[in-house]
């Protein structure tokens, strides 16, 4: 029986106005489900759920979300629960009931922090309290010994060596690891998204810099893992992971969220069983190696690259990853080393992302 890793935005509301938001349009007119629908879905499908990461919008704005966390922990303790928060968690748990649900029910926390500079982060997130909330939540997680990750956007605006050094210093101070999510143009490659799309050169330079100064502990990216580390990593999108939007829509990926990629809704009875037994996802996510990859040394390991990037840039899997620098005629003879680490994260194997650990003194 397949066990799914689920990313779930239970509500569409958010208290920030991020310049780069990948879900703003989708959340704008969302008809959100509520607690009864959430519980019904979990009750019917719990045997098929390995983990849940609660992401966009900001779940901590709704007390019912804390009730859901408590319900799942009490009834299905085998399901690992994680939260990605913009930092508002620290504000929400000033309520004792919410604090108890967090302490008892949440196994790990990702805190969004894109800049080590408070003013820059506040401007980037469109919220003057953004930096303070993030730091307060890091302190909260350290206090209650929750495994914590600083997650930062991989964009042309914030990926610099100076900012990387600052973020790693903050992570070290609070005993956290880090994770970089490459920016995705979910509403198309246009004048707005081009401001944030990170260049190949900037991205690879950042990875090489981090590998020398700190530790890369996991690289869940089919393209970059292949030619930077010589390791094969399968894209989990739609295979072991799915995304649930606030209106209950199910998609194969965090970033494939428009109508073209919706395959079902959690209000449908026994929906995870239905998805597994049908070809709903395999119609969208199927290993397709583009003809332009023929003869590449990484043709079978990379297999064309990351699914969501190919869809977002080109609308098809018949074209290779937009970050592919070209056909490799030989394998990398100086690969980046992935440092063995005992960390556990629901995001490791859930979506294409890269994890880091600050170097010890």
Language model feature labels by segment:
Residues 42, 66-73, 98-103, 135-138, ...:
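Short amphipathic alpha-helical segments and helix-helix/interface helices
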Residues 257-361:
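Flexible mid-to-C-terminal extensions adjoining Fe-S/redox cofactors in radical SAM and related proteins
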Residues 4, 238, 292:
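Exposed loop/turn and edge beta-strand positions of beta-sandwich/beta-sheet ligand-binding modules
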Residues 31, 105, 112-114, 119-251, ...:
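Radical SAM enzyme [4Fe-4S]-AdoMet core and its adjacent flexible, acidic
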Residues 1-100, 104-107:
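Conserved alpha-helical substructure of the radical SAM core
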Residues 18-21, 234, 306:
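Cysteine-centered loop/knuckle micro-motif
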Residues 56-58, 153-157, 313:
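Conserved short loop/turn motifs at secondary-structure junctions
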Residues 52-54, 83, 111, 150, ...:
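Buried hydrophobic side chains on well-structured beta-strands
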């Amino acid at each position: 029986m397949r066990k799914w890793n689920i990313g779930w935005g239970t509500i569409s509301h958010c208290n920030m106005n991020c310049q780069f938001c990948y879900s703003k349009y989708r959340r704008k007119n969302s008809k959100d489900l509520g607690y009864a629908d959430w519980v019904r879905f979990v009750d019917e499908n719990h045997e098929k759920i390995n983990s849940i990461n609660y992401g966009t919008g900001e779940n901590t704005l709704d007390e019912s979300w804390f009730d859901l966390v408590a319900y799942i922990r009490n009834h299905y303790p085998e399901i690992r629960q994680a939260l990605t928060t913009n930092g508002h968690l620290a504000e929400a748990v000033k309520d004792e009931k919410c604090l108890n649900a967090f302490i008892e029910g949440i196994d790990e926390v990702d805190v969004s922090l894109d800049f080590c500079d408070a003013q820059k982060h506040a401007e980037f997130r469109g919220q003057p309290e953004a930096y303070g909330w993030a730091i307060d939540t890091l302190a909260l997680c350290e206090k209650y010994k929750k495994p914590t990750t600083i997650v930062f956007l991989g964009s042309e605006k914030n990926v610099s060596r100076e900012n990387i050094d600052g973020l790693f210093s903050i992570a070290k101070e609070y005993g956290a690891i880090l994770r970089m999510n490459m920016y995705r143009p979910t509403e198309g490659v246009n004048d707005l998204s081009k401001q944030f799309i990170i260049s190949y050169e900037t991205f690879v330079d950042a990875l090489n810099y981090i590998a020398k100064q700190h530790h890369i502990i996991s690289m869940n990216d089919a393209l970059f893992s292949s030619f930077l580390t010589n390791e094969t990593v399968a894209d989990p999108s739609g295979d072991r992971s799915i995304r649930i939007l606030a209106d209950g829509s199910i998609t194969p990926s965090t970033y494939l969220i428009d109508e073209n990629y919706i395959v079902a809704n959690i209000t449908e009875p026994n929906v995870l069983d239905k998805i597994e037994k049908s070809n709903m996802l395999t119609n969208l996510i199927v290993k397709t190696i583009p003809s332009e990859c023929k003869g590449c040394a990484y043709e079978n390991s990379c297999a064309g690259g990351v699914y969501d990037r190919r869809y977002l840039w080109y609308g098809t899997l018949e074209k290779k990853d937009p970050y592919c620098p070209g056909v490799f005629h030989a394998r990398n003879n100086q690969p980046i080393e992935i440092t063995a680490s005992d960390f556990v994260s629901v995001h490791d194997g859930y979506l294409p992302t890269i994890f880091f650990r600050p170097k010890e003194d």
